Amino acid sequence: MKTGNQFKTVALVGRSNTPGIAEPLATLADSIATLGFEVVFEGDTAREIGIAGYPALTPAEIGARADVAIVLGGDGTMLGIGRQLAPYRTPLIGINHGRLGFITDIAASDMQALVPVMLAGKFEREERSLLEARIVRDGEPIYHALAFNDVVVNRSGFSGMVELRASVDGRYMYNQRSDGLIVATPTGSTAYALSSAGPILHPQLAGVVLVPIAPHALSNRPIVLPDDSKIAIQIVGGRDVNVNFDMQSFTSLELNDTIEVRRSKHTVPFLHPIGYSYYTTLRKKLHWNEHASNEDDKAS
């Protein structure tokens, strides 16, 4: 738990193209400003909701100026701004205005009660890891990207299986025929990797997971690797192969291109209300233990 007022400037970021988001964002901005904080808006958010009276900044300007960013939206909004603010280590507070909300853990109905308490310094902090990836062609890097959730190499919707050659730390692992291969962080283990039968990794676990997508051989199973592993995935066969970084696509892959993935040097601080439990999030989002229960998150 952290205490003590350590924030002066608060940035607000909203989910784009979302009806009904303008009013809660404006209300939140006014209430935070009333408490004596400087409030700034992410530029696209400010323009979309038509708010005036607050500075509208680029993500880079937010990173240089804001002490914390509050994200009102879904997990995708949190992932997007998290990647952009990662080099600045700007802490994020997530308010769920989307559907699933694995990483935007504060309900919109609770934000007016919880946000002032957190801005006063009462919160729980954790660091989330990212992946950095590059595409190498003929020995030269042609593209770089960061990923919060995952790097996914997969076939297009109209092509057949792809053949991928995977190696870890320079050591050959296997050739795999499948619809693709996912490299996921612990945060991303509850995203696409989970729907492909991958394991759930606790966010504080120092690991990454490799998850095949519909492999031809059932013996190709997910594997958890140390988070300092250097993973290389080479395109050996197939056509119209894509690589996605948190679903941001690069579609011009060629045979023998290699996607190199490793843990990023950047981490993103997440701030949670006091009493936050990752297990509560899993239980609610995955509908575990749906029968009536009086159990709480205290150790028995």
From Swiss-Prot:
Known EC number: 2.7.1.23
Single GO cellular component term: cytoplasm
Active site feature: D75
UniProt cofactor(s): a divalent metal cation
Molecular functions (GO terms): ATP binding; metal ion binding; NAD binding; NAD+ kinase activity
Database matches in Pfam families: NAD_kinase (PF01513), NAD_kinase_C (PF20143)
Function, as annotated: Involved in the regulation of the intracellular balance of NAD and NADP, and is a key enzyme in the biosynthesis of NADP. Catalyzes specifically the phosphorylation on 2'-hydroxyl of the adenosine moiety of NAD to yield NADP.
Name of the protein in question: NAD kinase
Origin species: Burkholderia cenocepacia (strain HI2424)
